[in-house]
UniProtKB/Swiss-Prot annotation:
Stretch list, region G2: 41-45
Name under which the protein is recorded: Probable translation initiation factor IF-2
Pfam family, one: GTP_EFTU
UniProt keyword Nucleotide-binding, yes or no: yes
The gene coding this protein: infB
Claim: Transit peptide is one of the keywords in the record: no
Gene3D superfamilies: P-loop containing nucleotide triphosphate hydrolases (3.40.50.300), Translation factors (2.40.30.10), Translation initiation factor IF- 2, domain 3 (3.40.50.10050)
Length: 593
């Protein structure tokens, strides 16, 4: 029987645009000298940093008067969307909360907006860190102080600038559908996003960010944070890597239960479920013990929430982002099925025709597919791992050329795939690779739109277009073999190599060449006067001066024009087409339909 549940430490991810201060903020939280005392010391976990509640209350002070049952905050060390979307837990995001870092002087940038969209998709609470407040001209630094204390020390001009910049963020958030306010003015945390002006460089405002996160967890998340302390461990694999003397290891965020040395564990591999036993659990040594040769300290067990390194046999092929479960009291089959189902539950809606997507982790694959779905881009196949030769060949067989593409998120392209791409038979296939989802999608959309225009242009070029011409008086340069006459183009677009017909439908010959100002041209627009050579007729017999002639468009071309390109035709082309089809449909009402 499991003992009574306890409240675990909430897991926090830091997100935001490149260079807005995500890493600096994490570094400041990790290395804050204010809390580096023995009691309530900030401890370094594998892939995460634990800030205990004692440290938070000492930094801010305000929570000391409130009863707090959240043990602290566990920050995932890898900042950015990728960490957030990669780390899943039971179908949702592993992170319980997020900090979105925004440069208060630059405002929202594309990655900021993408972060907010991802958080909205996952229904994850977050706080805005309006960073680099110390860069505002005239700002007086008050190292590590809460925002309101440091704000009170600024002159009126600086205070006014801070207020203006905060309200610019409020306005932008409102445009994106979020209600927000400066954190000290928020009364309903469920309906308003808190904006905390801060400086990762000086530590100003940092206590407030931690306090707001604790407050959010305390008020709205105590139920979802309840775990069974002695229950079987459940976690998410951050990274799979080889360590000297240990072999293959897993960096794991444990979010439920307890994991012990000797526990049987189940984890997802590339194409199979892997069962193995925990050989050792390792924590990084504190900085004070850095001179000790061993980098890791061995522990017998670990309880959620924590970052831990797991050494075990048979870990080759484990997927980053995979769920990991401990087996207890004979529920092995149930756990295997649970892991299999969780991997299969990745929400990727596949279509018969679509792009091929690759990513380095399960969660990243799901995040990419969700964003593609939001842009109405269909996905035919979604797989974890690098881009292979098989992917390129498969993309080359996709019927719709606008989907002959592979999108690779945070994962490499193998050399055999590069070789396959160099084959002339695969020249129509493109690979888009990178570590930022919105950039990948922008690049693909730009390529697709260009390709669409090119295909339409090619289709247009192959079609015989409508034209109506009149033979001009005093412009018969040769009567036959071929007849050479001057004509005015009354409507449409005249092309070389097309057949001509009289208004009664009688075919009279084919245009061999068009000349304008003594130069051969392939086509000429309405209103122009040109000389044409016509194979077939004799002037004075089949054709005469002042005769009107139409380009005799094949029926199949008329069908394509009317169904697919009519909207792209100029008024002159449309009018001439209508005249020509009206003449044809006098005899056969269904001609060209």
């Amino acid at each position: 029987m499991a003992k009574e549940s306890t409240i675990r430490t909430p897991i926090v991810c830091v997100m935001g645009h490149v260079d807005h201060g995500k890493t600096s903020l994490l570094d400041r939280i990790r290395g804050s000298s204010v809390v580096s005392t023995e009691e309530g010391e900030i401890t370094q976990h594998i892939g995460a940093t634990l800030v205990p509640i004692d440290a938070v209350t000492r930094m801010g002070g305000a929570l000391s008067k409130v009863s707090v049952n959240v043990p602290g905050l566990l920050f995932i060390d890898t900042p950015g969307h990728h960490a957030f979307t990669t780390l899943r837990a039971r179908g949702g995001a592993l992170a319980d909360m997020a900090i979105v870092v925004v440069d208060i002087n630059e405002g929202f940038r594309p990655q900021t907006i993408e972060a907010l969209q991802i958080l909205r998709n996952y229904k994850t609470p977050f706080v805005i860190a309006a960073n680099k407040v110390d860069r505002i001209h005239g700002w007086r630094v008050q190292e590590n102080q809460p925002f309101l204390k440091t704000f009170a020390q600024q002159n009126e001009r600086v205070q006014g600038m801070v207020e203006t910049k905060v309200y610019e963020l409020v306005g932008k958030l409102s445009d994106l559908g979020f209600n927000s306010e400066r954190f000290d003015r928020v009364s309903d945390f469920a309906r308003n996003i808190c904006i905390v002006p801060t400086s990762a460089l000086t530590g100003e405002g940092l206590p407030d960010i931690l306090m707001v996160l604790i407050g959010l967890a305390q008020r709205y998340m105590t139920e979802s944070l309840k775990v069974s302390a002695d229950g079987p461990g459940a976690g998410t694999v951050l990274e799979v890597k080889e360590e000297r003397g240990l072999g293959m290891t897993l960096d794991l965020i444990l979010y439920d239960g307890t994991l012990k040395v000797g526990d049987e564990i189940v984890v997802a591999g590339n194409d199979q479920i892997i069962e193995t036993k925990v050989r050792s659990l390792l924590k990084p040594r504190p900085m004070s013990e850095i001179l000790i040769e061993e980098r890791f300290e061995r522990v017998k067990s670990v309880t959620a929430a924590a970052g831990i390194k797991v050494a075990a046999p048979k870990l080759d092929g484990v997927i980053a982002g995979s769920p990991l479960r401990a087996v207890r009291s004979g529920n092995r089959d149930e756990v295997i099925e649970q892991v299999r189902r969780e991997v299969q539950d990745i929400e990727v809606n596949l279509s018969d025709v679509g792009v091929i997507i690759r990513a380095d982790t399960i969660g990243a694959l799901e995040a990419l597919s969700k964003e593609l779905e939001g842009h109405q881009i269909q996905v035919m196949r979604a797989t974890v791992g690098p881009v292979t030769r098989h992917d390129v060949i498969e993309a080359g067989t996709i019927k719709d050329p606008l989907y002959s593409a592979i999108i690779a998120f945070n994962t490499p392209v193998l050399p055999d795939a590069v070789d396959a791409l160099a084959d002339t038979a695969m020249s129509h296939v493109s690979i888009f690779e990178g570590g930022v989802i919105y950039q990948l999608i922008d690049d693909y959309v730009e390529w697709r739109d260009e390709k669409k225009q090119e295909l339409e242009r090619q289709k247009f070029e192959k079609l015989i277009m409508p034209a109506k011409i009149r033979i001009l008086p005093n412009c018969v340069f040769r009567q036959s073999n071929p007849a050479v006459v001057g004509v005015r183009i009354l409507g449409g677009k005249l092309q070389s190599g097309v057949d001509l017909a009289l208004p009664n439908g009688k075919k009279i010959g084919r245009i061999k060449q068009i000349q304008a100002k003594n130069e051969t041209v392939q086509e000429a627009e309405a209103g122009k006067e040109v000389a044409i050579s016509i194979e077939g007729p004799t002037v004075g017999r089949q054709i005469n001066v002042d005769d009107d002639l139409y380009v005799d468009i094949p029926e199949r071309h008329v069908k394509v024009i009317e169904r697919e390109v009519i909207d792209h035709l100029s008024p002159s082309l449309r009018e001439t087409l209508e005249e020509f089809t009206t003449l044809k449909r006098r005899e056969d009402p269904f001609w060209g339909k």
